[in-house]
Amino acid sequence: MTAPHHMPDLFALSEINGPVVRPGERAYADEVTGFNLASLHTPDVAIGATGPDDIVTAMRWAHATHTPVAVQATGHGANFPIEHGLLINTSRMTDVHVDPTTRTATIAAGAKWSHVMAAAAPHGLAGLCGTSTDAGVVGYTLGGGLPVLGRAYGFAADLVRSFQVVTPDGHLRESDPRHEPELFWALRGGKGNVGVVTSLVTELLPLPRLYGGGIHCHAEHAQTLLRTWAEWTHTVPDEMCSMFSVLRLPPIPQIPEPLRGGFWARVAVAWPGDPAEGQALIAPLREAAPVAVDTVEEMDHAALDRIHMEPQDPLPARECCMLLSDLPPDAMGTFLEQVGPGAGAEYPLLVASLRHMGGALSRPSAVEDAVCARDARYFMESVGIMPAPPVAEAVEQATRRLYTAMAPYGTGRTMVNIHGTPGDEQDIARAWTPEVYARLCHDKSVYDPDNLLRYGHAVTPA
């Protein structure tokens, strides 16, 4: 663990209702550890915020003492170590209030999508969740939020109506299209560069049920399934959402039989319309190659986790992504050369995927935001598990090879939530267009001129 350096007096933090812990104290590890165990956090002090007042107190102390600040709810996006400074843990702030009349939800900073689903489902409503309901709502949305049903409804940031946010000067602000509009712009897609969100209000959708799941073939059929899927994506309605993946699943109890320990090619689909129509639409995928496991069925929207079967337990992971301008045959060939059967069963990436973009994801938000993935036709992402240093190095090498090989087909940009470990300023800027990045840097200089919020995917004040 990194030794703490000299810290300013902590007396002001005694006003915080939640715990305040330092390295060496019994509760420290639980307070700072996130879902992604690849990043070891060693802040000099961590607070467990119980509400907006705690965050205001913490930010005023940080501003007065020039202490850098990091924020974590679930830690799914923890692709960087938090060293020194102050960590604000919002995981205790899980309140969700659903207004069925306005079809909106007010969601506190630490709430997971599972909390939102549970509160919204009795009203026949749902939010634009990503591939795991275990992820935090706020961090996901600040990065734009790429939903499972994105082609049908757009980015999660598009549905946000307002934020309550504490800016680095310690002021609690309300931000919407009419009040603090520039702050509202930067918070939707600009990640946590201009403040610490205490809650947001977002629209919900009347989505009680959907038709979805995965069509799994043995990996020897990956080429046939990929080419069929790619051609099929040019024919389907905007509401059909899908992703092709190559999966090397470990033989662990958390993975259900018969998928456990297998090497698979999979197309995951999600269709919010009539199940009979969805069944007809995916027929070409079921006919493309011998299907070993088919989990596609009508389900409650709250059961969305069954579609992509993301891990539910913390693990050390390396994730990365790339926006693709298209997916021509040579791009498919390159992808499979890197991750398919030819790469070997011992290839270290757990999953490498190609997601169909377009549809509502390509349409501008009704209110301008900082999301910069609307021009991508496809989206590539990968995850490697790193339980030990030799495996970690193999994962890093495989990741570099994959993204170098696929670079000719990319737009040159990433998505901030799945960007992976942020590098230098040039690398960080790849999550946005040059124009949006410059605007974010300007906003950073207005709201956070001292760069207190400097951890993770942080831009530089102009």
What are these regions (language model features)?
Residues 1-462:
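Soluble FAD-dependent oxygen oxidases
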